[in-house]
A protein has these predicted regions:
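N-terminal signal peptide c-region/cleavage motif recognized by signal peptidases
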Residues: 9, 14-16
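Flexible, solvent-exposed loop/hinge segments and secondary-structure transition points
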Residues: 20-162
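Sec-dependent signal peptide recognition
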Residues: 1-8
Length: 162
């Protein structure tokens, strides 16, 4: 009798566990789409005479593509990555993240590695799902700064069918 009860108890708990999956799938920006977004964003900034770096990351903030234009300052490589990383991991434009953290009393989120509050990072969406992000750095403040960078990022995303 003890064996039968133990077997029934095991089956009662094992069956639901077996029905659960131990894997998951995630949708992310493809390399081809990342190249297209980066190229179109760079072209948009060039059209306005800006020399920038464009970085596209996947949904988890891992770098897919980086394009540094001739004449773009060296620091723009790191800053464009931080903008794209922030937009991908927080699922919002980096400027919006910057606005939100101004209201925080805890500065911890701002001190995380690769996070920035500067404008210029924009999520790439497929429907409502964030599948990546593009970050641009290099437009001087006198020419619109991060806000201009964000406009170039949006132009790059708009050129690609996702």
């Amino acid at each position: 009798m003890k064996t039968s009860f133990a077997a029934l108890a095991f089956l009662a708990f094992a069956a639901p566990a077996a029905a659960q999956t131990s894997t998951m799938s995630e949708v992310t920006v493809s390399t081809d789409a990342a190249i297209q977004v980066a190229t179109a964003a760079l072209a948009a900034c060039r059209a306005d005479g800006q020399k920038v770096t464009v970085t596209v990351v996947d949904h988890a903030g891992r770098e897919k593509v980086r394009l540094r234009d001739d004449g773009a300052a060296p620091h723009t490589e790191v800053h464009s990555f931080r903008k794209s990383y922030t937009a991908a991991t927080y699922r919002m434009p980096s400027a919006e993240y910057g606005s939100r953290v101004k209201e925080l009393t805890n500065i911890g989120p701002v001190l995380l590695p690769n996070i920035t509050t500067a404008a210029g990072g924009v999520p790439i969406r497929a429907g409502e799902r964030v599948i990546g992000a593009v970050g641009i750095s290099g437009t001087p403040g006198s020419a619109g700064g991060g806000e201009h960078d964000a406009k170039c990022a949006e132009a790059g995303i708009a050129k690609v069918k996702l």
